[in-house]
């Protein structure tokens, strides 16, 4: 459970894929977060947990964009003042979208522009299409991503195709989308936890801004490990997220949040921190936080956010 009483944090889904992911985040029930589902298709805006925002007007009659990103962009631009009002006084804004379709690729960059203009730290979390969806949809996704980069401080990219290459086992189509949604949801929740949780060694919004503002592509990893070799297991797991497009090698900025019970040794904390830091650039800006959590038992938990990744 995440509780936030100190800053306005907004999570906005744009298009069908983005809205589905935002609903997953809302289902985790972090408090003090504002959720919007933004779409040109009025039928898609039916979640009780998320406030619906319909991009209507001359460019959309409530029936979507038919894969036309230009229509999605025009619909968002026509409603720009309304979008700007959604992010008034917002400190951190997450923009979730599935790229390749008309609304996600066309409208998401304009939504990010509104969040950025309102002064929010703007973090985009996006997916790219499967290869079987065709070259045209991939081109639309790539063009949307380039527009999104103009207005986002940080971007997490999840290529759907990585689901196939990340496992040797057969996976159902439904489970593939669940995995993709899980990565997107966990990425958002990780940042929310770091921002909103009171820690023994604290990480605040100024720290997050220092690492993520105007940072470009970022990597997010989460892991827990227990047992005799838990340090090596933890580091190997948290520094490798095969579903993301970018790894964390040579990162220019790094946020590390560790939690463990009161029996964790200083040597273990030191070893974990050093091993994770070894993956970054020599002059990386590293910000570190820690909190005790006896509910973890023998487990150590770590979350990392790496910026300026290649």
Question: What is each PLM-predicted segment?
Answer:
Residues 1-310:
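Tubulin/FtsZ superfamily GTPase core signature
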């Amino acid at each position: 459970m995440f509780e936030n009483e100190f800053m306005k944090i907004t999570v906005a889904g744009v298009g069908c894929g983005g809205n589905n992911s935002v609903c997953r985040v809302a289902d985790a029930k972090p408090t003090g977060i504002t959720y919007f589902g933004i779409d040109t298709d009025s039928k898609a805006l039916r979640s009780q947990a998320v406030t619906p925002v319909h991009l209507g007007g001359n460019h959309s009659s409530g029936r979507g964009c038919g894969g036309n990103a230009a229509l999605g962009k025009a619909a968002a631009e026509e409603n720009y003042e309304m979008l700007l009002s959604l992010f008034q006084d917002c400190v951190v804004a997450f923009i979730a979208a599935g790229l390749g379709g008309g609304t996600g690729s066309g409208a998401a960059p304009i939504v990010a522009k509104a969040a950025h203009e309102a002064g929010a730290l703007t973090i985009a979390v996006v997916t790219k299409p499967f290869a079987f969806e065709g070259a045209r949809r991939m081109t639309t996704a790539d063009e949307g991503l380039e527009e999104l980069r103009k207005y986002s401080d940080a971007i997490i990219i999840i290529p759907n195709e990585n689901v196939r290459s990340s496992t040797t086992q057969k996976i159902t189509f439904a489970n593939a989308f669940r995995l993709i949604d899980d990565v997107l949801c966990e990425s958002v929740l990780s940042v929310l936890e770091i921002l909103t949780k009171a820690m023994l060694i604290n990480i605040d919004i100024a720290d997050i801004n220092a690492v993520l503002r105007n940072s470009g592509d970022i990597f997010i990893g989460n892991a827990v490990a227990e047992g005799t070799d838990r340090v090596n297991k933890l580091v190997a797991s948290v520094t490798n997220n095969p579903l993301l497009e970018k790894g964390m090698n040579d990162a220019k900025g790094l946020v590390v949040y560790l939690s463990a019970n009161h029996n964790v040794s200083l040597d273990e904390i030191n070893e974990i921190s050093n091993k994770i830091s070894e993956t970054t650039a020599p002059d990386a800006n590293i910000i570190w936080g820690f909190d005790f959590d006896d509910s973890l038992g023998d487990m150590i938990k770590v979350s990392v956010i790496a910026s300026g990744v290649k």
